[in-house]
Amino acid sequence: MQHKSRAIIATLCLVTASVGASSGRLAAQSAPHLVPASIQNAQKETLEQLGSLAAKPGAVGVEAGKVLVLLKNHAARENEFILPPLTLLPYLADGKVTPDMAWALPMIDRVKAEREQIFNEHAELTEALNGLIVAATAANDQDAKEFAENAAADSLADMEILEPTILLIGETLRSKLPAPH
């Protein structure tokens, strides 16, 4: 329970910092662009859990180590250009589109251009997570198995929900911003 309380407090601190940093300048963020605090917190927690699993002896540790390498690389790419446009969602949901949001368009264009590569990264990550599930099942490590199953579901959600959402953000911006965006 104490761990969850700390996670909630950390999330609130990140949200407060994000709101404070963005007040007075709607979406005119300077590079590097922010990633939504909830996603930052989830990434951090996932990488910490995976690090603990990778430190385990035997096949579970080996397979978790493989996933950790893939996930760190993918998370770095996500933080670079995939996730920052999501910070615009609260504004878009309120019907607010301003010219200073155009910073997101090159990132969104990159997501669109690299869809196949992003898909392949998720497929490789899912394959590695399946290896962790097999190792965890053989080792009777229910925690590792559940972690891998949940991480695989998160990866699928990225492809089914996150990527299309980012592309819709781009379409919304392009339809409401003045040309040449």
Say what each PLM segment does:
Residues 2-6, 13-15, 20-181:
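Small-residue-biased structural context
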